[in-house]
Design a protein with these regions (language model features):
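TPR/TPR-like (Sel1-like) alpha-helical repeat modules
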Residues: 180-195, 202, 206, 219-220, ...
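Alpha-helical segment of the N-proximal tetratricopeptide repeat
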Residues: 3-11, 15-29, 234-253, 260
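Short helix-capping/linker turns of helical repeat alpha-solenoids
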Residues: 10-13, 26-28, 46-49, 62-64, ...
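Hydrophobic face of amphipathic alpha-helices that form TPR/SEL1-like repeat modules
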Residues: 19-26, 55-62, 91-98, 102, ...
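Structural signature of tandem alpha-helical TPR/SEL1-like repeats
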Residues: 2-3, 31-40, 67-76, 103-112, ...
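Terminal, low-structured helical/coil segments at or just beyond the last alpha-helical repeat
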Residues: 200-230, 341-364
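Canonical positions in the second alpha-helix
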Residues: 8, 43-44, 79-80, 115-116, ...
């Protein structure tokens, strides 16, 4: 385990505590230890780390590493929402709207929805638009609805747009069916290069012309035949075969499979090749090739590559020293779900969570 992080946690760095919790939670550089992970999350949360509060809420909600606990879940969910975590705020909207763990309270749901939309969180902006469109605990206002929908479009991504389109196409999440609005959101996704968005757009246009209406389940099955989904399967298969060959000692075959997976954009394969070309034990060492693969891995979403590039730019190893580029890489890793990036950022600033949110609307 990274001694820097351990030492910083001992000295009271709440983001080092968060990183330790994450590492125990995910089994990174340590044994998987759910109880120790929760202990570190709580230590971090009790000292003011808002992300730790949200992680605890999810742990007690999902029950993946400990038994679900509705009381602990609501405690940490409310704490995370009060601290301004938009994902927690959005979850609280649903809880107050539907009732169950809390008394059903549409007014409270709307108030939390308004707060999360004010943070430019696209999911909140979309449902705020729906609230004004359909009169959910507020007077209908078409102009306000369109304004919020426009904001959601500016801040969202293709996956969200498909979700919005499905809500209007199939009448999900309490939204009235509106095929024209469904087409609008599917087109937004298609314009960003999503073949799922394009397929859904064509499907709705066929329905408008009298064609057969697909169910959501049928739509999902149709997605399985799309080129993007088939490509993901191929590259994952190549990666899996590469790992098997590597474990068995068939290194030439392993490298071949990793290269094929990398050519299809697999982030893990790209990162593996970056490591192999840097180590020089299985292939001849070539740092130029290694850095190229590392760049591509980071772009493809490898948080390991993003953290490593952050360190490279920070220290000026093999690249010109660039503090701003280093911070961007650390923030990118966080946005893609690697909480160790918070510790790296905390060495440069007091509020790394705000820094990340200023750059990324959607943080995993």
């Amino acid at each position: 385990m990274d001694r820097r992080i351990v030492k910083a946690a001992e000295e009271g760095n709440i983001y080092a505590m968060l990183s330790l919790a994450y590492m125990h939670h995910r089994g990174i550089d340590s044994e998987f230890d759910p109880l120790l992970a929760i202990e570190e999350y709580k230590r971090s949360a009790s000292r003011g780390c808002t992300r730790a509060k949200w992680e605890l809420a999810k742990i007690y909600r999902d029950g993946d590493i400990v038994e679900p606990n509705p009381y602990e879940f609501m405690h940490w969910l409310t704490a995370a929402a009060d601290a301004g975590i938009p994902e927690a705020m959005m979850e609280l909207v649903v809880r107050y709207w539907c009732g169950g763990l809390v008394l059903k309270d549409p007014s409270m749901a709307f108030e939390w929805l308004r707060k999360v939309a004010e943070q430019n969180y696209p999911l909140g902006e979309f449902f705020m638009g729906c609230a004004y469109l359909q009169g959910w605990n507020v007077e209908k206002d078409a102009a306000e609805a369109e304004a919020y929908f426009q904001r959601a479009r500016e801040h969202g991504d293709a996956d969200l747009f498909i979700r919005f389109g499905r809500n209007f196409e199939f009448g999900m999440a309490g939204i009235e069916v509106d095929l024209e609005r469904a087409k609008y959101w599917y087109k937004c996704a298609a314009d960003m290069g999503s073949d799922r968005g394009y397929y859904s757009l064509l499907a709705v246009e066929k329905v408008a012309k009298g064609g057969r209406y697909e169910t959501p389940e049928e739509r999902d099955r149709s997605f399985n035949d799309l080129p993007s989904v088939q490509e993901v399967r191929r590259r994952n298969k190549m990666l899996e075969e590469g790992d098997i060959h590597m474990e068995q000692g068939y290194y030439d075959k392993a490298v071949d499979r990793y290269m094929k997976a990398a050519d299809l954009g697999n982030a893990e394969a790209l990162y593996m090749l970056a490591i192999l070309y840097h180590d020089g034990e299985i292939v001849r060492r070539n740092d130029d090739i290694s850095y190229d693969y590392l760049d591509r891995a980071a772009i493809a979403g490898s948080t390991d590559a993003q953290l490593q590039l952050g360190k490279i730019y920070e220290e000026g190893r093999g690249r010109k020293q660039d503090r701003e580029r280093a911070l961007e890489m650390y923030a990118m890793a966080v946005a893609n779900g690697n909480l160790i990036g918070y510790y790296e950022l905390s060495r440069f600033m007091d509020h790394p969570e705000k820094f990340v949110r200023q750059r990324y609307r959607i943080v995993r």
